[in-house]
C-alpha cells in the first residue's frame, strides 16, 4: 500500500475533506476548494471565569520534517507539503527544509528560512508523535516570523538583545509574551 503523509503546512479544524464550517458560515465549501477559513477568525467564548475573544479554532501549522526519516523507515511512500493558498516562496522553503533532512544534513538554517517565510508562531507535530500542547494557536493569527531576540528597557531606553544580525529589507514585529 502506498502511504502518503502530510508533513508541512496548515491543519484543518475539521478532517480535511469533511469541513462544513465554511459552507455554513458563508456558503463557500472547503470541500470544493473555496474555504474562507472561518476557523482562523476570532471567536468569543464564555465560561465560569468570564468570557474572552481568541482564535479558539485556529490550529498551529504542522511540521514533522525532522521525523521524515522515521516515517520513511515505517514505509511512507509520499510526503505532502501544503501549497494551496500559500505563496511560492513558502512552498520552496518547505521543500528545501525537507530535502536537507533527507540528505542527512543539519536543517536549522532551512527551518529558520521557513519560519521567516510564513509562521504562525509555533509548529506542532500533531498527534502522530504524542500529544502536542501546541496543537492550537489561539493567541496569534497570521504570520509572525521567527523569534530573534528580546526587547529590554534599561534606564528608560529600549534595547534589543539578539544574536541575529539584521539585513537590509528585514522586518521586525514586537510581541508581548
Model-derived features: positions:
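Surface-exposed amphipathic alpha-helical tracts and adjacent flexible/coil segments at the periphery
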Residues: 1-177
Amino acid at each position: 500500500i502506498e502511504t502518503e503523509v502530510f508533513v508541512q503546512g496548515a491543519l484543518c479544524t475539521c478532517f480535511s475533506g469533511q469541513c462544513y464550517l465554511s459552507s455554513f458560515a458563508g456558503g463557500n465549501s472547503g470541500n470544493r476548494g473555496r474555504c474562507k477559513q472561518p476557523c482562523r477568525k476570532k471567536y468569543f467564548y464564555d465560561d465560569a471565569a468570564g468570557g474572552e475573544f481568541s482564535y479558539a479554532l485556529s490550529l498551529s501549522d504542522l511540521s514533522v520534517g525532522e521525523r521524515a526519516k522515521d516515517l520513511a523507515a515505517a514505509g511512507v511512500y509520499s510526503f505532502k507539503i501544503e501549497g494551496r493558498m500559500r505563496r511560492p516562496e513558502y512552498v520552496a522553503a518547505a521543500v528545501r527544509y525537507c530535502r536537507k533532512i533527507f540528505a542527512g544534513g543539519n536543517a536549522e538554517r532551512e527551518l529558520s528560512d521557513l519560519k521567516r517565510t510564513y509562521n504562525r508562531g509555533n509548529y506542532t507535530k500533531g498527534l502522530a508523535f504524542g500529544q502536542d500542547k501546541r496543537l492550537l494557536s489561539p493567541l496569534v493569527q497570521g504570520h509572525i516570523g521567527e523569534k530573534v531576540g528580546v526587547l529590554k528597557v534599561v534606564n528608560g531606553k529600549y534595547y534589543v538583545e539578539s544574536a541575529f544580525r539584521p539585513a537590509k529589507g528585514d522586518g521586525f514585529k514586537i510581541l508581548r509574551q
